[in-house]
Amino acid sequence: MLKEKLHPFIQRYNEINELLSSPEITQDIKKMTALSKEQSEIEPIVEKAKEYMNILEAIEENRSLIEDEELGELAKEELKELEPKKEQLEEEIKVLLISKDPNDEKDIYLEIRAGTGGEEAALFASDLFKAYARYAEKKGWRVEIVSSSESDSGGYKEIIAKIKGQGVYSRLKYEAGTHRVQRVPETESQGRIHTSAVTVAIMPEVDDVDVEINPNDLKIDVYRSSGHGGQSVNTTDSAVRITHIPTGIVVAMQDEKSQHKNKEKALKILKARIFEKRMREQQEALAKDRKEQVGSGDRSERIRTYNFPQNRVTDHRIGLTLYKLEEVMQGDLDQIIEPLIAHYQAQKIQEAGL
């Protein structure tokens, strides 16, 4: 019963209230801060729980009045309103009860790489980046290109951008994986559809507490940065390549004129990649334990197909097909993101036995 699951939260909330007013706690700033944080975390559950208890009481009261000659009809009308409210509250409470992803409020590094399909893949990498940038704009987030490598046709072989704002990771985390595109390239005279792919990685920005790197585990190379077509654009060794020896992760950065700035940027991305790798390994281990492979954010997992001739986009994880590709590419990504969030929330609720 959901009611039983809510009582400990109400008890703990009241307990914290008492503790916060005790002189022993008010003199200990560390304890006071920790308790206030805990209280603010459970407050949304407690508020909904109280509302839910009131509705349950009202339902019980009205049910007892159904046989009453004078109040029976009124009680039936009340119940018609209360029952749907109860069901809606139950769903809202279940979502609040499932464990929150600690990374949900973090900013992210978005990395898009052209895969199979050469120039066509690079052009789609550019189109996909623009779609995310438009989506970010709609959400009031800030997008900053950290590094990019252009292809001959003006697409991106690879682009890394930082996206900052409220709840960025919570909404974009399900974008990680392989995105397949089917369309007729402009250079195709026969009108044949070509299939190409890009991979997307979504890495929460991490601080030193999340990822500690031993300097001895790093191999740092400096070299001259090169421009489009390979020509050298710098006379000093400002470009930086950092290799994390234990994981084999390599980050190269040459977008800044200063070696120091390139190194700083490269280290931040390196930490994010290490963190994302660890996170992915944990998710894969959990998925094996559950004998199922959920959308784990694995880059090799094909998550979505964009079919331009049919104006169709399909998300393979939840079997969602929309004939609104144009809207999606203009940044209207919530049409896909909202059903994905709902799907994974429902999965978590089921796993939690709620």
UniProtKB/Swiss-Prot annotation:
Major localization listed first in the record, in broad terms: cytoplasm
Keywords: Cytoplasm, Methylation, Protein biosynthesis
Pfam families: PCRF, RF-1
Transmembrane regions listed in the UniProt entry: none
Region annotated Disordered, chain positions: 284-308
Modification after translation: Methylated by PrmC. Methylation increases the termination efficiency of RF1.
GO cellular component terms attached to this protein's record: cytoplasm
Basic and acidic residues bias: start-end ranges: 284-304
GO MF terms, alphabetically ordered: translation release factor activity, codon specific
Annotated localization: Cytoplasm
Residues bearing PTM N5-methylglutamine: 231
PANTHER family tied to this protein: LD18447P
NCBIfam families, sorted: prfA, PRK00591.1
Family: Belongs to the prokaryotic/mitochondrial release factor family.
Function: Peptide chain release factor 1 directs the termination of translation in response to the peptide chain termination codons UAG and UAA.
HAMAP family (UniProt xref): Rel_fac_1
Protein name as catalogued: Peptide chain release factor 1
Organism from which the protein derives: Nitratiruptor sp. (strain SB155-2)
